[in-house]
Amino acid sequence: MDAFLQAAIEEARIGLAEGGIPIGSVLVLAGKIIGRGHNQRVQRGSVIHHAEMNCLENARRLKASVYQRCILYSTLSPCPMCSGAILLYKIPRLVTGENKNFQGPEEYVRSQGVKVEVLQDPACIQLMRDFIKARSELWNEDIGE
């Protein structure tokens, strides 16, 4: 398994252990993780702390030229809000663990020039499948339903 996706899965598991939604993300520059995060909507009582947003926040302020050389990894297909952040900061590549349990606007992100790779990783799929089955009400809240 890709080491960076594995790091994102570790973040997702941390979030689950904290009582949150198991989605994780890492930001990679030149083969090094420069930001990592997990969904913290429950833990922080936040409407915006999705994994990707938390990851970008934890990377701190970076020059635009840095984002433009990064790869963002996420265990689940990013939602419209997080996809917007990818486009805003011109992150050129997104690697997603899976999009079977939820699919964000991947085609739109691609149409804006971002290389989107969906791995359909069994661990990512199962982690979300188990969570959705156990906590469907919380999951539906997270995706705005």
What are these regions (language model features)?
Residues 1-15, 68, 78, 87-145:
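Zinc-dependent deaminase
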Residues 17-23:
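A short helix-loop-beta-strand connector motif used in the catalytic cores of GNAT acetyltransferases and
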Residues 23-31:
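Short beta-strand scaffold segments in enzyme catalytic cores
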Residues 34-41:
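Short beta->alpha transition motifs characteristic of CBS
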Residues 43-54:
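A short, polar/charged loop-to-alpha-helix boundary motif
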Residues 52-76:
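Mobile, glycine- and charge-enriched loop segments
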Residues 55, 79-82, 86:
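Short cysteine clusters
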